[in-house]
Amino acid sequence: MAVQQNKKSRSKRGMRRSHDALSTAQLSVDATSGELHLRHNVTADGYYRGKKVINK
């Protein structure tokens, strides 16, 4: 089992944790339906970049 040789300082611990923060989801409004969706993803009704790509 690995054990550290020296104690990590508060600064080094904080620098390591600086990448752990969560970011909010990037949402876009569809041009045709006006529906909110995740960026680079198909909307719930099957539109992507203004075109119907999924037929249900």
Curated annotation (Swiss-Prot):
GO cellular component annotations of the record: large ribosomal subunit
Highest taxon in the source lineage: Bacteria
BP GO terms, sorted: translation
A molecular-function term among this protein's GO annotations: structural constituent of ribosome
Region named Disordered: 1-26
Pfam families recorded: Ribosomal_L32p (PF01783)
Biased composition (Basic residues): 7-16
Key words of the record: Ribonucleoprotein, Ribosomal protein
Protein family: Belongs to the bacterial ribosomal protein bL32 family.
Protein's recorded name: Large ribosomal subunit protein bL32
Native organism taxonomy: Bacteria, Pseudomonadati, Pseudomonadota, Gammaproteobacteria, Alteromonadales
Gene encoding the protein: rpmF
